[in-house]
């Protein structure tokens, strides 16, 4: 059965129409939306992570608070920018949060997306070595993160304090968390690397490459390549694959007021540039639920993935986003199974 989750960008700004005017609004409403989503029957509550922006930057306190208010819904990120992370400390935070949640974390990590800061991770003390790219830095931090989660010895013990010279692992450890780490992949090449590293695949609403084929088909190629490489990599467990889509069903006058006149260009794939590289962006799915179902059934990547993350307009508030999720769960989800 395909899992459905929401993905919140956590925007907050004191502008007309925004119900998340402060960072506190965005944080508390993220918690409330996770509670509402669980009551509706949505499978996952995921948040984006961005630094130096009016968005969510520190995921672990938020995820822990969401965990304390819920019982069954998966809780995750899409994605944590590993350029900014100390891999070992991130592993400690992730394990503690996962224990609080009862093993419900699904953490997406990656190199991160284009940002407002120029080389922002360097201000956190993480500077690429000579000849190293920021993508290399993110992968290096991720390797430490995975080692920590796997329970490897990290630091030599002080024999005077411990009576041993063994390497000490990080604590706490949370069983099974290592298999619930996802890599946010924007190309077919990084999908291959993700499979080799033994991480689940998280594919977003864009790919940083374009071959001229529709976005869903290109993303489906990425998913199949990931699964093909996984099958030969020797892992003894089955990975998961998620894709993200903007889905805005119109069933009420309020829906129509918000999205009825959405620009036509957002209802089709777009091609542009990110970080001086060509990229293909997926379209928004807007309209009557039956129309959206028909379009999603024709989206090869949506049908290939086992998890669909729906991006939500978080600044419209908890009640409205709960309404959107309820419509998706009731009128769209059954047809996708």
Protein language model regions, located:
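Hydrophobic faces of well-ordered beta-strands that scaffold small-molecule active sites
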Residues: 4-8, 45-47, 75-78, 105-109, ...
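Glycine-rich, proline-tolerant flexible connector loops at the mouths of alpha/beta enzymes
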Residues: 44-66, 81, 205-216, 311-320
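An alpha-helical appendage that flanks or caps ligand/catalytic pockets
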Residues: 130-170, 203-204, 211-305
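C-terminal helical cap(s) of enzyme catalytic domains, especially alpha/beta-barrels
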Residues: 124-130, 142-146, 215-226, 317-337
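Active-site mouth loops of central-metabolism enzymes
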Residues: 13-27, 80-87, 177-185, 280-289
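Flexible, glycine-rich active-site loops centered on histidine and acidic residues
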Residues: 2-23, 84-154, 209
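N-terminal beta1-alpha1-beta2 module of alpha/beta enzyme domains
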Residues: 1-73
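Conserved, mostly hydrophobic/aromatic
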Residues: 4, 41, 49, 66, ...
């Amino acid at each position: 059965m395909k899992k459905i989750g929401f993905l919140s960008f956590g925007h907050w700004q004191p502008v007309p129409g925004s119900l998340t005017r402060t960072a506190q609004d965005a944080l508390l409403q993220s918690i409330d939306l996770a509670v509402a989503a669980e009551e509706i029957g949505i499978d996952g509550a995921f948040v984006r992570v961005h630094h130096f922006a009016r968005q969510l930057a520190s995921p672990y306190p938020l995820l822990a608070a969401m965990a304390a208010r819920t019982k069954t819904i998966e809780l995750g990120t899409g994605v944590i920018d590993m350029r900014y992370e100390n891999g070992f400390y991130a592993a400690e935070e992730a394990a503690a949060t996962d224990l609080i949640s009862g093993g419900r974390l699904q953490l997406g990590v990656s190199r991160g997306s284009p940002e407002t800061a120029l080389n922002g991770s360097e201000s956190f003390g993480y500077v690429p070595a000579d000849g190293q790219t920021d993508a290399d830095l993110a992968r290096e931090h991720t390797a430490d993160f995975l080692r920590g989660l796997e329970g490897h010895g990290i630091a030599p013990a002080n024999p005077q304090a411990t009576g041993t010279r063994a390497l000490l692992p990080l604590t706490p450890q949370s069983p099974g968390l290592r298999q619930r780490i996802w890599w946010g992949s924007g190309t077919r090449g990084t999908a291959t690397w993700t499979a080799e590293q033994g991480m689940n695949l998280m594919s977003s609403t864009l790919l940083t490459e374009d071959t001229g084929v529709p976005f869903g088909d290109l993303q489906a190629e990425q998913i199949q390549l990931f699964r093909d490489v996984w099958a030969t990599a020797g892992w003894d467990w089955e990975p998961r694959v998620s894709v993200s889509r903007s889905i805005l069903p119109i069933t009420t006058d309020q829906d129509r007021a918000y999205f009825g006149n959405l620009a036509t260009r957002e209802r089709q794939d777009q091609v542009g540039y990110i970080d001086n590289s060509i990229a293909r962006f997926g379209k928004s799915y807007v309209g009557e639920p039956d129309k959206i179902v028909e379009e999603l059934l024709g989206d090869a990547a949506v049908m290939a993935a086992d998890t669909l993350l729906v991006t939500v307009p978080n600044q419209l508030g908890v009640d409205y986003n709960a309404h959107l999720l309820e419509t998706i769960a009731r009128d769209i989800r059954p047809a996708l199974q």
